[in-house]
Amino acid sequence: MQITDTKIAIYGAGAMGTVLGALLTKGGLKNVHLITRNETHTKAMQDTGARIVCVAENTEFTVKVQARTPAQITDKYDVVFLMTKQRENVKTLEFLKDYLSADGIVCTTQNGLPEQSVANVLGAEKAYGAVASFGATFVGEGSVLLTSKWQGMRMQVSGYENDNAKQGLLLEILSFAGKAIDNTAFAQKADNLQGARWSKLAINSAFSGLSVVTGKTFGEIAKKRKSKKVALGILRECMDVATAQGVVLEKMQGHDMQKLLGGRSFLKTKLALFLLPIAMRKHKKLVSGMLKDIEKGRKCEIDYINGVVSKEGKRLGVPTPLCDKVVELAHGIENGLYEISEKNLDFFEI
């Protein structure tokens, strides 16, 4: 099959999904369908295209895309990039079964550790993962803000407990996104998928988790004395659980997180606290997507971020009191027991 004949779905074309679908289309792939339950977003993309605004570089483009709601799907896809929230994974994957070609695969880009859920429903041979290293915010029907620089965008892909036979196909598909922005490094092999997952999970648990319960940006969390101490503690809990799993953390932005932040001596802790604001400088204006969910009255996916660290820690006998507290507070906020406030930091013993 020619790559141009490959049928591709972006299932969950919110902020990140719209960016990926727009780039693949702009790069030259014509069989890319952007699928979302948001009917007004779908119609806007059908009428005027997908508009991507790169705030870091003050540039933008609009590209005509093929947008669908789930009810409008009629095709069977060779590759589905799963970009929804994890809370409904089983239901979503059961639905997608009928829309996969005989040897079709699902590549999940979700945060946390999502590949196992794909394998459970579809079988390990159809389960692939991608770690997406870019940020985006949904701002209106048909329009998305990209919070990363074009040349800084990356996607690392690999199979999950299978022979990785479709990794080459995924890399070729994603190379078209790279072509759209002259970024030859966009598509990359993930030689250590779980290491990359855990590195990103550690960052998300520390900063996205605390952003949910405090309402603060990542930069504010990394700057203020109490919050950055809690963030460092969460990062270390994630490192400890990953190590107990036998996972070697991948470098983040070229830096060895374990080496820079993992040391527990007084001097190494002091250095780590000094480095946190520097490390988060590029992401200082971000707030958690989970915070936005809660503000809109939705349940967030804290159980799949800090919650999965707590779950794995309990299974392996590794204490995770800080992650446990983030989960407790986030659910308390969802249920009206707590308010989103910086005062919630007082609940953390550090």
Tell me the role of every PLM-derived stretch.
Residues M1-N58:
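NAD(P)+-binding Rossmann beta1-loop-alpha1 motif at the extreme N-terminus of oxidoreductases
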Residues T6, D78, M153:
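Nucleotide donor/acceptor-binding cores
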Residues L100, V144-S158, S211-I221, V287-K296:
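Helix-loop-beta segment of a Rossmann-like dinucleotide-binding subdomain
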Residues T109-A206, S211:
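Rossmann-fold dinucleotide-binding core
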Residues Q194-A222, K226-V241:
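Active-site-proximal catalytic alpha-helix in oxidoreductases
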